[in-house]
């Protein structure tokens, strides 16, 4: 299955920056520049990628932009057997009924990303 043909599919990894324990999460950036920054660490893995324009429609979006604690490197903490500190923010947003959550890029805080908890809020616009 090509993910480019199903762009609103949730992350397949069992854990991520803002998902764990079977939670749904689809990750995206708000700009092409944000995508380039976010994907830099994955380039060179041989996976072909394409940009897919999407529209997020929701009245319930949590905003953690400007909160550096939501953008910390989480993998080391998780690999040490602890819960990711970033899960506090996504769990709280989910508990309050958010469909998605905005957050700042770790390496370029002026850029924003979004994690979508309910992929039904996404539609393809390309």
Name each model-derived stretch.
Residues 32-44:
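Short active-site loop/helix that positions an aromatic residue
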Residues 28-30, 103-104:
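Short His-Asn-centered micro-motif
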């Amino acid at each position: 299955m090509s993910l480019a043909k199903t762009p609103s599919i949730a992350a397949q990894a069992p854990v991520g920056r803002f998902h764990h324990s079977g939670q749904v999460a689809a990750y995206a950036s708000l700009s092409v520049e944000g995508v380039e920054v976010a994907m830099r660490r994955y380039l060179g893995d041989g996976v072909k990628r394409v940009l897919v324009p999407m529209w997020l429609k929701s009245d319930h979006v949590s905003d953690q932009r400007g909160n550096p604690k939501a953008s910390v490197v989480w993998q080391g903490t998780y690999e040490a057997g602890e819960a990711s500190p970033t899960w506090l923010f996504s769990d709280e947003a989910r508990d309050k009924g958010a469909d998605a959550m905005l957050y700042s890029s770790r390496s370029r805080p002026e850029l924003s990303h979004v994690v979508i908890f309910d992929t039904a809020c996404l539609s393809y616009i390309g």
